[in-house]
């Protein structure tokens, strides 16, 4: 798949994160793309509005997808997300059998932006360290280098600035 295709899906994930933020949640979004390039599922963060501590976009999408699709189908899919999946979400992606993950911002960069805020507690255990134990060889792509160049556009797209991302002052 071309970089332009990855960028297209990441831009849609940004739109989903804007929708999540507008609904009162933190701005995270994820979507699932099948092997033909069709978006088959979208999910924003629901942690705050639904009062579900595991309501991250990626974990919720993985749970929904595993209920709706077969493991074989999901192995050929790609999950796109605005930020690198946390350890919990990486586990959900693994158990759902989603074959690929593409994210725009590393977990460590997210931690730099949010600081140690109780709404974004992190294990500092990126999916890049969780997935290598997977014997099925799930694949992931870090588009962070290019994403860094797009970050001001990302902040503008979700309606905030770097200083007020997630409503926190840095």
Model-derived regions, located:
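Zinc-dependent deaminase
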Residues: 1-20, 94-170
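Short beta->alpha transition motifs characteristic of CBS
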Residues: 40-47
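Short beta-strand scaffold segments in enzyme catalytic cores
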Residues: 28-34
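A short, polar/charged loop-to-alpha-helix boundary motif
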Residues: 49-59
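Immediate flanking context of iron-sulfur cluster ligation sites
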Residues: 71-83
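Glycine/small-residue-rich phosphate/adenosyl-binding loop
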Residues: 41, 58-67
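Local cysteine-cluster metal-coordination motifs and their immediate loop/turn environment
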Residues: 82-100
């Amino acid at each position: 798949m071309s970089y332009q295709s990855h960028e297209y899906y990441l831009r849609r994930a940004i739109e989903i994160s804007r929708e999540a933020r507008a609904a009162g949640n933190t701005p995270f979004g994820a979507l699932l793309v099948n092997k033909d390039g069709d978006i088959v599922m979208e999910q924003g963060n629901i942690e705050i509005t639904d009062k579900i501590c595991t309501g991250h976009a990626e974990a919720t999408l993985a749970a929904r997808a595993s209920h709706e699709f077969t493991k074989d189908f999901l192995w050929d899919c790609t999950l796109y997300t605005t930020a690198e999946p946390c350890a919990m979400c990486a586990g959900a992606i693994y158990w759902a059998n989603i074959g690929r993950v593409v994210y725009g911002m590393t977990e460590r960069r997210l931690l730099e932006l949010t600081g140690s805020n109780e709404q974004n507690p992190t294990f500092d255990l990126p999916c890049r360290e969780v997935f290598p134990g997977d014997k099925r060889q799930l694949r992931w792509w870090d588009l962070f280098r290019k994403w860094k160049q797009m970050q001001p556009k990302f902040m503008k797209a979700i309606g905030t600035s770097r200083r007020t991302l997630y409503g926190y002052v840095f």
